[in-house]
C-alpha cells in the first residue's frame, strides 16, 4: 500500500493484473504463491484508495501499459469518445461507466458548430458516433475530432474502431485515415 501511495504521489501509475478473484481461483492462488489472494472486493477497495489501475486479463494489462507509455496518466476521469458506430458509442459509454470514467456532455455553446461538421444523420453526443458518411475522410473527420475535443472538458480522448475482418483489406485505409485524423 505504501509503495502504491508513494508512486501515486509522484504521478507514477501502477497497473495490477489481479487473478484469483473467483472462489476456486483464490484457492489456487493461495496454494501456488499466496500473493494477492483474498476478497476481490477488499483488493478493489485497496486499488481504488491507492490509485492502482486494476485489469482482469493480459490483453487489458498490455493495452493499459501501452496507453500509459504513449499518453501518460489521464489528468481526469472525463473522456471524449469517438466511434463510427452507434452501437460502438453505446458500448464505450457502458464500459466506461463500469470503470468509473465519465463522458461529460458537449458544451451547449459549441453544439451547433459541431453539428454543422457532422452529417445530418449524426447526433451530437459524447461519446460521438460520427457516422459512416464521413468515415475514412480525414479532411472531414479531423475538424469533427478537433471541435469535439475542444467542446468537452476531458482529460483524455479515445477513438474506438472495429478491426477489419480478414479479407476486408480494402477497408483498412478508412481506419488508418480516421486514426491519422484523430492523432493530429
Residue ranges and their predicted role:
Residues 1-184:
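Catalytic-core regions of core metabolic enzymes
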Amino acid at each position: 500500500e505504501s509503495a502504491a501511495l508513494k508512486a501515486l504521489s509522484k504521478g507514477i501509475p501502477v497497473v495490477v493484473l489481479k487473478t484469483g478473484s473467483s472462489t476456486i481461483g483464490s484457492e489456487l492462488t493461495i496454494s501456488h504463491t499466496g500473493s494477492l489472494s483474498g476478497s476481490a472486493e477488499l483488493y478493489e477497495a485497496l486499488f481504488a484508495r491507492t490509485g492502482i489501475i486494476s485489469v482482469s486479463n493480459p490483453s487489458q494489462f498490455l493495452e493499459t501499459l501501452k496507453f500509459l507509455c504513449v499518453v501518460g496518466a489521464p489528468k481526469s476521469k472525463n473522456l471524449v469518445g469517438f466511434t463510427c458506430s452507434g452501437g460502438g458509442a453505446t458500448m464505450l459509454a457502458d464500459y466506461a461507466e463500469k470503470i468509473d470514467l465519465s463522458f461529460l456532455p458537449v458544451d451547449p455553446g459549441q453544439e451547433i458548430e459541431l453539428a454543422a461538421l457532422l452529417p445530418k444523420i449524426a447526433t451530437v453526443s459524447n461519446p460521438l458516433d460520427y457516422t459512416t458518411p464521413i468515415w475514412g475522410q480525414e479532411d472531414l473527420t479531423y475538424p469533427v475530432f478537433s471541435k469535439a475535443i475542444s467542446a468537452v472538458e476531458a482529460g483524455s480522448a479515445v477513438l474506438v474502431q472495429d478491426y477489419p475482418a480478414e479479407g476486408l483489406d480494402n477497408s483498412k485505409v478508412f481506419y488508418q485515415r480516421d486514426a491519422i485524423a484523430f492523432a493530429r
